[in-house]
Amino acid sequence: VILLLLIASAPSVDAQPKTKDDVPLAPLHDNAKSALQHLNQRCCQTFYWCCGQGK
């Protein structure tokens, strides 16, 4: 029983210190969203059906 309590109170993976190689995910998400919006705009200008309005 004591062993189970010790395991449950151990630090989780999220508690690890950040390293210099860690990259925040928010900028990556913003870049991906921006790229998809740009591709969608180019596609809609060229092909009416690919932006979902031609259905």
UniProtKB/Swiss-Prot annotation:
Domains as described in the record: The cysteine framework is V (CC-CC).
Q: Does the keyword Signal apply?
A: yes
Indicate whether Manganese appears among the record's keywords: no
Q: List the expressing tissues.
A: Expressed by the venom duct.
Q: Which GO terms describe its molecular function?
A: ion channel regulator activity; toxin activity
Mind telling me which Pfam families this protein's record contains? Chi-conotoxin (PF16981)
User: What is the protein name given in its UniProt record?
Assistant: Conotoxin vc5b
Its GO CC terms? Answer: extracellular region
Which residues constitute the signal peptide according to the record? Answer: 1-15
**Organism listed in the record:** Conus victoriae
Q: Tell me which family the UniProt entry assigns to this protein.
A: Belongs to the conotoxin T superfamily.
Which compartments is it annotated to reside in? Secreted
The lineage's top-level taxon is Eukaryota
